[in-house]
From Swiss-Prot:
Protein species of origin: Burkholderia cenocepacia (strain HI2424)
Protein name per the record: Chaperone protein HtpG
Localization terms from the record: Cytoplasm
Known role: Molecular chaperone. Has ATPase activity.
Region of interest (C), ranges: 560-632
Length: 632
């Protein structure tokens, strides 16, 4: 096949500019990324080799070899993994196939440490070679293809690259970096080994380099024709916990999660019994950019008897734990396991149950930490993944109680929007005669905190949970009680504070009788806008509020459904009025502007709970007219 020159995809040009000009101070990452890619190529060969053993071509010992040539000023990274065909080389090295290209560029922060980590996360690590090289040559042959179908790809990291057909006996890929001026410090065994041991010690493949020894005559270190393994070269999860340092766990996490930050916590154990497997699970410190995308692929890396099977085995974890990263290595699953088999396998169901329990135990340890560092970690976790965890109440009935104990909310107990109150905390502070856990839902913490529905609760010193996450209304349809105490909305149905409001009830009944004619006329004036108008004792400072009937959808949920473009059933709220408020006391059912006052009280109540007016212009006109009549 003839020599061919092709242009990079536009995003690649932008990326190359970033690599060369923005990440220089963190240049060591080039080796981390290229070794990681070589490891992935070996994993892919193992997986495809399960179905076709001939792909190994009588060379079953997989390895990565790193070399350098001082005279030529080159570094080579060579693997005998799956390799690439011509089309794959163009697709993998000339374009960014992933849909997250735009997100990649919007995530760049200018912090070189963080930006360097994003490179791996977005699958563009190959281009990091241009940080230290002004030309990269890739020679590759895909396993199973004849020697004359190998490919040479070459680029100087500018606008284009060349593709040539070559002969290559060895399957796999050899990447040659032609170093830029000033990068000669990398042409040293000691330097390259230190980078490998820093970033890639956990790679399960042996990483080989030629041995080096002192030559007395030359007075320098010289390379020998003998290889040595420069990394641990064993799957980290197969080692005993006592043999793995925290730093090694952290490096391994950063490798599999493509994350620059340390994990919040991890757990590592071997399970024996009905199913035998090893699990190594990590909780990240921050959410990935695409956690809420519909096509987000969570899941764990699945190995069977140390053979890599797949990257994102979603069947091993429920959806609400999709943020958990890690590895499961099963001793029981067949090596030819497919996603279809995973869905039906009893062994997988047993593993899923065990992994879920272990992940929840990990979160419980964080949540119950007594020390400040542990508390801070759970706060970080909740900020990143709290909304995802709430999904578990509807998804995982068996573990619902455990999940409920992990939930955190803002509340009226503190004047802050921090979600740090557990349901157990709330119950421990309940009044002796209080029988329910009270909550209010709203779009924002400010709206929830200032809701008129809270007035009587403040007066009585009763704590109310302030729920402002979009998932909360859905969550509440599964969370009906905690510790035997039912959850109750302060904006739904008749408010019953038990013995806490006996006096108010008597006063309410008396006041209700006194203004009964006004209440009846208000219902007439508002018509179908409301289901009912009634006197309330839940207000102390506001003249009116809206509440939903016990079996009706809340106003907040209606607004949320409409915002999502869904049809929300038309609901009639109940208008409650405060008979002690000066505005209500002055209502005259026989006055000409009585209807305007009724609509004003309704509209005010709707606005106070974060609702939208159907006709803002009429509201303004009506308000102005009433103000003018009062002024006159």
């Amino acid at each position: 096949m003839a020599h061919e020159t092709m242009s990079f995809q536009a995003e690649v040009k932008q990326l190359l500019h970033l690599m060369i000009h923005s990440l220089y101070s963190n240049k060591e990452i080039f080796l981390r990324e290229l070794v990681s890619n070589a490891s992935d190529a070996a994993d892919k060969l193992r997986f495809e080799g399960l179905a076709d053993n001939a792909l190994y071509e009588n060379d079953p010992n997989l390895r990565i070899r790193i070399g350098y040539d001082k005279a030529a000023r080159t570094i080579t990274i060579d693997d005998n993994g799956i390799g690439m065909s011509r089309d794959e080389a163009i697709a993998n090295l000339g374009t960014i196939a992933r849909s997250g290209t735009k997100e990649f560029f919007t995530k760049l922060s200018g912090d070189q440490q963080k930006d360097a980590a994003l490179i791996g996360q977005f699958g563009v690590g190959f281009y990091s070679g241009f940080i230290v090289a002004d030309k990269i040559t890739v020679e590759t042959r895909r396993a199973g293809l004849p020697a004359n179908e190998a490919v040479r790809w070459e680029s100087a990291g500018e606008g284009d690259f060349t593709i040539d057909a070559i002969e290559r006996a060895q399957r796999g890929t050899t990447i040659t970096l032609h170093l830029r001026e000033g990068e000669d410090d990398l042409l040293s065994s000691h330097r390259l080994k230190s980078i490998i041991q820093k970033y890639s010690d956990h790679i399960a493949l042996p990483i080989l380099m030629r041995k080096e020894e002192w030559d007395q005559e030359k007075g320098e270190m010289v390379l020998k024709d003998e290889d040595e393994t420069v990394n641990q070269a064993s799957a980290l999860w197969t080692r005993s916990k006592s043999d793995v340092t925290d730093e090694q766990y952290t490096q391994f996490y950063q490798h599999i999660a493509h994350d620059h930050q340390d994990p919040l916590t991890w757990t590592h154990n071997r399970v024996e019994g009905r199913s035998e497997y090893t699990q190594l699970l990590f909780v990240p410190a921050h959410a990935p950019f695409d956690l809420w995308n519909r096509d987000y692929r969570g899941g764990l890396k699945l190995y069977v008897k140390r053979v890599f099977i797949m990257d994102d085995a979603e069947q091993l974890l429920p959806q609400y734990l999709r943020f958990v990263k890690g590895v499961v290595d099963s001793a029981d699953l067949p090596l030819n396991v497919s996603r279809e088999i995973l869905q039906e396998s009893r062994d997988v169901k047993a593993i899923r149950e065990g992994v879920t329990k272990r992940a929840l135990s990990m979160l419980e340890e964080l949540a119950n930490a007594e020390d400040d560092a542990g508390k801070e970690k759970y706060k970080t976790f909740w900020g990143a993944f709290g909304q995802v965890l709430k999904e578990g109440l509807g998804e995982d009935h068996a573990n619902r109680e455990r999940i409920a104990k992990l939930l955190r909310f803002a509340s009226t107990h503190g004047d802050t929007d921090a979600q740090d109150v557990s349901l157990a905390d709330y119950v421990s502070r309940m009044k002796p005669e209080q029988s329910k856990i009270y909550y209010v839902t709203a779009d924002t913490w400010q709206a929830a905190k200032n809701s008129p529905h809270l007035e009587v609760f403040r007066k009585k010193g009763v704590e109310v949970l302030l729920l402002t996450d979009r998932v909360d209304e859905w969550m509440l349809s599964f969370l009906h009680e905690f510790d035997g105490k039912p959850l109750a909305s302060v904006a739904r149905g008749d408010l019953d504070l038990g013995e806490l409001n006996d006096e108010e009830k008597k006063a309410q009944e008396q006041a209700g009788e006194a203004i009964k004619p006004v209440v009846e006329k208000m219902k007439e004036a508002l018509g179908d806008k409301v289901k009912e108008v009634r006197v309330t004792f839940r207000l102390t400072d506001s003249p009116s509020c809206l509440v939903a009937d016990d079996n009706d959808m809340s106003g907040y949920l209606q607004r949320m459904l409409k915002a999502a473009g869904q049809n929300a059933p038309a609901m009639q709220p109940i208008l409650e009025i405060n008979p002690e408020h000066a505005l209500v006391k002055q209502l005259n059912a026989d006055s000409a502007d009585f209807g305007d006052w009724c609509h004003l009280l309704f509209d005010q109540a709707l606005l106070a709970e974060g609702g939208m007016l159907d006709d803002p212009a009429s509201f303004v006109k009506r308000t102005n007219a009433l103000l003018l009549s009062r002024a006159a």
